[in-house]
């Protein structure tokens, strides 16, 4: 009968324990990596800077890594259209304001994202513009305690010679959650939802 060296078994168990702890730590670290602050991507909450590219760049980075939370901290962040992506939670901290910029060229139309459906071809492109846009997205959340302010941006080419962008426009999407945030000063609809749940 072959004898087992007990000291080697103890070393193996100790190594296994260290490896297990290391993997657990890596797992916890990766959870921390799923939070992205728009300020880290160049956004400024000064109420002056156009943050459209910075916010969209942050959402894109979050989405490319499998999703997570995009933090909008305290401040007033002027922006044009924000393109929502699957598995991304847009979280507005207390006293955070996402405010529509007074430049209609900065707003995208849902028609830009969804060119298949005849419904969007009937409506004028101006009618389909929004501050927050999502087409074919899943598991999107807009949460927190902040404000999304449409800033009542008027469009002379819009319906009735005044209607500007919606605050939120979602199409062909599912698993959408909106909680805690306030939607203010829409120049058209606060939320326009088509084939989305």
Q: What are these model-derived regions, one by one?
A:
Residues 1-2, 197:
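Short intrinsically disordered, low-complexity coil segments enriched in acidic
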Residues 2-16:
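Bacterial N-terminal signal peptides that target proteins for export
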Residues 19-22, 27-197:
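Extracellular/periplasmic carbohydrate-active domains that bind, remodel
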